[in-house]
Design a protein with these regions (language model features):
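Generic N-terminal targeting/processing segments that precede catalytic cores or assembly contacts
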Residues: 1-3, 18, 22-24, 29
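Short alpha-helical scaffold segments that flank and stabilize functional sites
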Residues: 19-20, 57, 61, 81
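Residue-level detector of functional hotspots within protein domains
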Residues: 6-8, 20, 38, 45
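Amphipathic, hydrophobic secondary-structure cores in small proteins
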Residues: 25-27, 31-62
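C-terminal binding/interaction regions
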Residues: 1-17, 65-86
């Protein structure tokens, strides 16, 4: 992606994380996999479902799930679902 857009995204996410009392560094290792997942879902099974899927990953992670494994599982499910788009 465009480096300027990515810098703005990171600036925003730092603000957002602080607003909800989350250490912004939690995104370091999962940023690109989450962005990839959202892209696959938004261009595949459901555009409006993409951000909500990311929310579900966050909830599952908070319940003890492994973020990267969850992302991988959901990307596989989205790819199996095909290219039908809402």
């Amino acid at each position: 992606d465009n480096p300027e857009k990515m810098a703005r995204m990171r600036d925003w996410l730092e603000i957002a994380a602080r607003e909800v009392d989350v250490d912004p560094s939690v995104l370091t290792d999962v940023e690109q996999p989450l962005l990839d997942m959202v892209s696959v879902i938004s261009h595949g099974p459901s555009r409006p479902g993409a951000p909500l899927t990311a929310f579900l990953v966050g909830i599952a992670t908070a319940q003890g799930g492994d973020t990267l494994q969850l992302v991988k599982k959901l990307m596989q499910a989205a790819e199996q679902r095909g290219q039908t788009r809402d």
